[in-house]
């Protein structure tokens, strides 16, 4: 091949390459990757620009009382309630009034401390409370209540596999330093116009037409029987595939282990005059399941089985509370583009569940 032909082919391929990336970026990818803080995780991972919820552009907090984050706590101010959980407890929804703890503080008129990162293990809230109990840190803080939160789909693997170890030990100073030095943080990738996401975006646009998970996506896309979200594609729902795959983990045996672990912790805390609350955050799939057109999908019985257990703790039944809300026609209880609930859900739950 002559040098002139090589140059021509090189220029042509470069134009095609750049043109593809510019076009895909402008019509799709920039809406889900340009500013990941303003896009929910489900839309971002599925490249569903028609499901992006503009609510993420509003980060305002207009509630009269706010919670305290553990990375800023001085261990002098009064704390009535301590919350320990996952991304739901750390405002991962990235929108207006994103912290449910602020609704607790406002409606119950109490001071709330959130432990942002669990100690000595990822997503280990039960163990973190045991460490705080055995170290004497709870004696120092003197809370009246502790709330353990976990998203439904990961609750069994966190709490329902083995008996809780109540002999865990750490010093108060170790815990204080850890909580101060480990604030909850998000990994924010930087994306330019030329990026591999443009290829995935085109591929997903095609494959989602034939398969609800585009054959290899982590996100499932299904039709709804009625409008549930105020986005361009308001009768579609995005679901985390884990929500479906993990349904079978909730059985009578695992639910019993989960309940026993919570009862053990509740009994230990009761000796200190502390009430334990447990709040599993209902999966988006479970909450909206009866409004999904596809009848071949499984159904979760996690909440139904847990309701039957004898409890020494207070169970916050988020499925029962939020199901009534969506059955009444409320939309955007969860964000269309995200796996987290909206401020509407937090308001609904904690206007009813009061800490007194």
Where are the regions that the model predicts?
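Extracellular glycan-modifying ectodomains
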Residues: 1-356
């Amino acid at each position: 091949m002559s040098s002139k032909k090589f140059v021509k082919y090189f220029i042509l391929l470069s134009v095609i390459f750049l043109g593809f990336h510019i076009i895909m970026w402008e019509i799709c990818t920039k809406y889900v990757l340009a500013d990941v803080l303003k896009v929910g995780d489900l839309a971002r991972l599925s490249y569903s620009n028609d499901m992006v919820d503009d609510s993420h552009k509003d980060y305002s907090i207009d509630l009269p009382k706010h919670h305290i984050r553990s990375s800023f706590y001085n261990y002098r101010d009064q704390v009535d309630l301590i919350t320990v959980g996952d991304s739901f407890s750390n405002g991962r929804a990235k929108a207006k009034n994103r912290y449910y703890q602020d609704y607790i503080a406002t409606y119950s008129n109490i001071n709330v401390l959130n432990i942002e990162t669990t100690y000595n293990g990822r997503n280990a809230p039960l163990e973190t409370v045991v460490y705080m109990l055995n170290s004497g840190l709870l004696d120092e803080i003197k809370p009246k209540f502790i709330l353990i939160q976990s998203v439904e789909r990961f609750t069994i693997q966190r709490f329902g596999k083995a008996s809780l170890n109540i002999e865990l030990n750490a010093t108060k100073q170790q815990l204080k330093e850890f909580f101060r030095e480990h604030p909850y943080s998000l990994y924010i990738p930087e994306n330019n116009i030329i990026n591999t996401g443009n290829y995935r975006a085109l591929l997903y646009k095609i494959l989602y037409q034939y398969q609800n998970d585009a054959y290899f996506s982590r996100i499932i896309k299904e039709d709804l029987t009625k409008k549930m979200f105020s986005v361009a594609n308001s009768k579609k729902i995005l679901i985390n595939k884990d929500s479906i795959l993990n349904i079978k983990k909730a059985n009578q045996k695992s639910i019993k282990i989960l309940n026993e672990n919570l009862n053990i912790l509740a009994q230990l805390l009761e000796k200190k005059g502390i009430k334990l609350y447990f709040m599993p955050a209902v999966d988006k799939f479970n909450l909206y399941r009866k409004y999904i057109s596809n009848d071949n999908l499984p159904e979760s019985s996690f909440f139904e089985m847990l309701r039957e257990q004898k409890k020494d703790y207070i169970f916050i039944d988020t499925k029962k509370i939020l199901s009534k809300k969506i059955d009444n026609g409320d939309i955007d209880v969860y964000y269309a583009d995200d796996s987290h609930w909206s401020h509407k859900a937090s308001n609904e739950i904690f206007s009813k569940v009061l800490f007194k």
